[in-house]
């Protein structure tokens, strides 16, 4: 029997419902339970795949090829479960499926309404996503009081009635602000948020109160009194330097035990020693390395959320504080590579469109010519190919057909056909819809013997997640290989280039996939760990060169 924990948010958005949900999931998992997490998004887009990163942040890709909310990235980084397309759905997806059923005649001519048809569809999708788990944590996007969230809130209200309070639990996350002018903590916003939730028919069982500093006991008692929530169920969650501390903070306040008690679950004590090790390693680095992330969405760091976390994970596993310098590629076009002079390593992430492309190419050229560690991810690998073709293979004006359809040397072109993991042949052509038509999800990759990639992974075949519709042009690969480009990874059917390296460079790697999606704080990822180690080595080499003249003078 699956138990359901519904997590809602009040007062303001961006309080951290996703991280709180994931942290509770980590606690329950440590107590011996199988856990899954769902994210319900109230926007009308079918999925976030075609949304601007500036509006939505990162699009997280699941193993089965779904383009989902970035919170699913938090879920996978905190719990061992692998998310699927069933773990995230939107209002748009719900309405699309209901309308499809209506057109098919499934409702026998009935009038289609929000209640019961939309709410019933939401409940069906929640149950499908939760299937097989001991506990399903269901995060409802948006803020209580938003019109968009009402069908989701009504659906979970109905699930409480249908399943009872031994199988369902409501957790409400609110803001408890500190007003500096008055020198007081204000509980009134939380009181009103709970009042709004109760007017919908939902009484929260547990409150998680977000604040700058830990809540005093007197304020917790006051909140409990005015919200009808028992005082032990009012949890204080103040700001922390590392999100990986949160499972420990919530565990120490007894949140996992309270949940198990209310849901009548017999569970063991939560052993979070691995999280303690993660936090200790992050707080006590022995080295520092500076990484330039050269992109076009740098004004919103959530656009590269999994990427920044993967670099932090690599730092944890190399005892290194990773300083991330986000550099707009258009700024490099304007001011040149002087912006890269002080960094120890360069990373060019994925992206779409022609804006800022030449700045990324300059960054790749700077890394190649100066022996600086380079990691190109997805578009970043394609950028490295274009730069190499132009400046090493004498292919003047080489480009991707995404940016220049008439380029004389189309070293990167549209992927028209590939074999999916299940052996199914997928096909695409110009003019297809943008949504959901890329090469998506986990795909197997065969690594070249004696390559850097093979040494980093320690195996000859890996599965990594993809999100792209352009690939390296096989017709021109031979010419590039003659000039020193190493194809270190290929798709299992040998049709697509998955990884590249440079034989005469200390550490230069490109991958068509997104390794950041499978990096976790407890395990890291071999490519990022290798990248940070290379950055440290480059930093030490630079220091040695700078120290050499002064040593000669001393002698």
Swiss-Prot record:
Give binding positions for UTP: 13, 186-191, 222
Q: What class of enzyme is it?
A: ligase
Pfam annotation, one family: GATase
Question: Under which EC number(s) is this enzyme classified?
Answer: 6.3.4.2
Write out the catalysed reaction: UTP + L-glutamine + ATP + H2O = CTP + L-glutamate + ADP + phosphate + 2 H(+); L-glutamine + H2O = L-glutamate + NH4(+); UTP + NH4(+) + ATP = CTP + ADP + phosphate + 2 H(+)
Q: Name one GO cellular component term.
A: cytosol
The UniProt entry's sequence similarity note says: Belongs to the CTP synthase family.
Q: What does the record give under GO molecular function?
A: ATP binding; CTP synthase activity; glutaminase activity; identical protein binding; metal ion binding
Q: Which UniProt keywords apply?
A: ATP-binding, Glutamine amidotransferase, Ligase, Magnesium, Metal-binding, Nucleotide-binding, Pyrimidine biosynthesis
Q: Where is the Glutamine amidotransferase type-1 domain?
A: 290-541
List positions binding L-glutamine. Answer: 351, 379-382, 402, 469
Q: Name the positions where ATP binds.
A: 14-19, 71
This chain belongs to the protein called: CTP synthase
Q: Where does CTP bind?
A: 13, 146-148, 186-191, 222
